[in-house]
Amino acid sequence: MSRALLKYIRLSPTKARLVARQVQGMNAEIAIASLEFTPNKAARVISKVIASAVANGGYDAQDVIILSCRVDAGPVLRRFMPRAKGRATPIRKPMAHILVEVGTQKSVQQSVQSTKAKAKGAKNIKSEDSKNSLKVTESKADSKVDAAQKASTTQEKAESKTKVAKAKVATTKSTATRKTTKKKTEGEEK
């Protein structure tokens, strides 16, 4: 597997990603040929980076697959354009970093097989860990039940306190309305 990186290219990363997605997983020779006829600045740049990655690995372009073609955002040049009434509006000139990784079909198949073997080994380790974790989860479940019971009792206490508080508010309102009605009736009698 070899790679090539082109940094600080004056190109919009969003426009370059459209081309990069088309190329990913293709044969390098076919990708370069198709990019030659794509009327896009990003296509010309990405084809050069693919050719560089193939040359870096010392491969023949017919035997190589593009494993990944990634376009990351670089810094943005900020310029200003003068406008009417003394104003200026910003102009963004973005840059991009392009990373291409290529590999032969044989190396790709070997890496896939090795990752499958690693995954099988990890499953065996996980099954042993799951037996131990069952014991831990049982003790955690017991503690959660205790916590839930405590929470329900505290919630019941809080609900009873709110009922008492609401009753007090209701009695104070009724006494206040009685006092105001007494004052009104006394005022009418005078």
From Swiss-Prot:
Basic and acidic residues composition bias: residue spans: 125-147
Location of the region described as Disordered in the Swiss-Prot/TrEMBL record: 111-190
One Pfam family recorded for the sequence: Ribosomal_L22
A Gene Ontology cellular-component term: cytosolic large ribosomal subunit
Record carries keyword RNA-binding: yes
InterPro entries according to UniProt: Ribosomal_uL22, Ribosomal_uL22_bac/chlpt-type, Ribosomal_uL22_bac/org-type, Ribosomal_uL22_CS, Ribosomal_uL22_sf
GO BP term (any one): translation
One Gene Ontology term of the molecular function aspect: structural constituent of ribosome
Record key words, sorted: Ribonucleoprotein, Ribosomal protein, RNA-binding, rRNA-binding
Biased composition (Low complexity): 167-178
UniProt keyword DNA-binding present: no
Subunit record text: Part of the 50S ribosomal subunit.
Similarity field: Belongs to the universal ribosomal protein uL22 family.
Function according to Swiss-Prot or TrEMBL: This protein binds specifically to 23S rRNA; its binding is stimulated by other ribosomal proteins, e.g. L4, L17, and L20. It is important during the early stages of 50S assembly. It makes multiple contacts with different domains of the 23S rRNA in the assembled 50S subunit and ribosome.
Matching PANTHER family: CHLOROPLAST 50S RIBOSOMAL PROTEIN L22-RELATED, LARGE RIBOSOMAL SUBUNIT PROTEIN UL22M
Identification of the protein by name: Large ribosomal subunit protein uL22
Protein's gene: rplV
